[in-house]
Amino acid sequence: MKASQSFLATLKEAPSDAEVVSHKLMVRAGLIRKLSAGVYNYLPLGLKVIRKVENIIREEMNRAGAIELLMPMIQPAELWQETGRWEKMGPELLRIKDRHDRDFLIQPTSEEVVTDLARNEIKSYKQLPVNFYQIQTKFRDERRPRFGIMRGREFSMKDAYSFDRDTEGLKKSYQIMFDAYTRIFKRMGLQFRAVTADNGAIGGSGSQEFHVIADTGEDAIVYCPDSDYAANLEAAESLALIASRAAASVAMAKVPTPDKTNCADVAKFLNIPIESTVKSLLFVADQENGPAKLFMLLVRGDHELNEVKASKIPGMAESRFASEAEIKLACNAPAGYLGPVGVSADATVVADRTVANMADFVCGANDAGHHLTGVNWGRDLPEPLVLDIRNAVVGDPSPDGKGVVDICRGIEVGHVFQLGTRYSEAMGCTYLDQQGKAQPMVMGCYGIGVTRLLGAAIEQGHDEKGIIWPISMAPCEVVICPMGYEKSEAVKAACDQLHDGLLAAGVDVILDDRNERPGAMFADWGLIGAPFRVVIGDRGLVDSQVEFKGRTDAESQNIPLTQIKEKVIAAIQTTKQSIV
């Protein structure tokens, strides 16, 4: 391919609304152009990267036995009403009405549609297991689209859905998809981690996320360098940091702590470690019938509450922070001075594992301007309900017992779920077993953010010059840069011969035949991220030499013209082999 046929559209400056590196570089490199908030045109080079990503995904999904189909972007509301997600998903659904005033939506995902397909087409256990997948445009009406394609409203996604006879079958299908995802991201040349995750709005019994490791990632990944343990911060288990509770050594006392409303200030004022303080948080869970329920959650002063874990406490799924009036009623004190001693008997006290093993701790006294010191469980207040409700921190013991954890940042690009029978039971998706009895199909679902992968790869691979693509994703494998393509017959002939020879060998090559200065040409391809560059000019041809340079190489090499084709092919093959 020649550059004159590729519609190169590079820019010197990034758009003013671009916040992250990937957004800036994708616009500057001519991969995307913004149409409206969270909606983008993909220019030819950007589309070429998408097609390479899709091809890898499609090859591995087919290899794993999944069957490709295509489901409509527009879906009827009735299916989503069957599962309750029409109401639950709220404003994220882009809802539309047709001319007959019937409700539809633009799909954000397709569990309902594929379940409807399965219940109409699959009748017998003999037809199971089966796994359908599609690569299709999705839409989620994000409140605040940002970060370019990383958090857009319209995006491309590969979503797959497995149907099995039972849970054992689901586990096998799930593992097949997990292995396929691992191969996909390895082939793309990305540094990634598979982590234990929360199921979120899709539901189900178990899930794992695949994250591309990047300092700018939105998600915190808790992992153990000495083992394979990794989990999203929301789902990472936090063990008790104190092996067992010490005996009480002092009497409880109320002490003045004027204007000290957080644990750090209290610890400094009392000249004690912050690890000796306890943070008290009051929540309210409103009930449809009857009075609201109160929950006081306790974490150590230097720890943070994990709200996802808290939402799984029985009765707290729809809870909220208590208002000032509710705090006053339950504790007779303002926020900042709350504590479990003397709290309303209507409140359920839940202590994190570490707090449950603390002795002689400091907490709010439920009295403005005062805290309690020397507080002990059993003596000064009843034993609490003990649960894991905090965020993990660096240095925590790894839940698998193989060292301590660290935390890095990641960008979620894939998610696999064991859905179970949530959707099949809600929608009557059944099959007849060997005894002729109707059984609900057991489902799994598996997603990959196709367009998001472009942004994630750039966040992971870039420098001051531009994008550093993994070779399997790059818009080309090598670019040929002539010095005077239209001015020198010798240069033109050498470039054309190399271009045609590489094409015949199956190399993805671009010949930059534009009338551009060498510096501008080199800057463009450094920005776009061509993995390899060949420079051919009259000066080098005098000695039958050309320049060869890798995208991250400090210096170029002089290669004999007669050997450059083999050099390029060998470099590409070596690079590809290093990432598989």
Swiss-Prot record:
Gene3D superfamilies: Anticodon-binding domain, Bira Bifunctional Protein, Domain 2, YbaK/aminoacyl-tRNA synthetase-associated domain. Keywords: Aminoacyl-tRNA synthetase, ATP-binding, Cytoplasm, Ligase, Nucleotide-binding, Protein biosynthesis. SUPFAM superfamilies: Class II aaRS ABD-related (SSF52954), Class II aaRS and biotin synthetases (SSF55681), YbaK/ProRS associated domain (SSF55826). It is found in: Cytoplasm. InterPro entries: aa-tRNA-synt_IIb (IPR002314), aa-tRNA-synth_II (IPR006195), aa-tRNA-synth_II/BPL/LPL (IPR045864), Anticodon-bd (IPR004154), Anticodon-bd_dom_sf (IPR036621), Pro-tRNA-ligase_IIa (IPR002316), Pro-tRNA-synth_IIa_bac-type (IPR004500), Pro-tRNA-Synthase_IIa_type1 (IPR023717). It comes from the Bacteria. One of its GO terms (biological process) is prolyl-tRNA aminoacylation. It catalyses: tRNA(Pro) + L-proline + ATP = L-prolyl-tRNA(Pro) + AMP + diphosphate. GO terms for molecular function: aminoacyl-tRNA deacylase activity; ATP binding; proline-tRNA ligase activity. GO terms for cellular component: cytosol. Pfam families: HGTP_anticodon, tRNA-synt_2b, tRNA_edit. The keyword Protein biosynthesis applies. Transmembrane segments: none annotated. Its main location: cytoplasm. Its EC number is 6.1.1.15. Homodimer. Belongs to the class-II aminoacyl-tRNA synthetase family. ProS type 1 subfamily. Consists of three domains: the N-terminal catalytic domain, the editing domain and the C-terminal anticodon-binding domain. This is Proline--tRNA ligase. It comes from Polynucleobacter necessarius subsp. necessarius (strain STIR1).
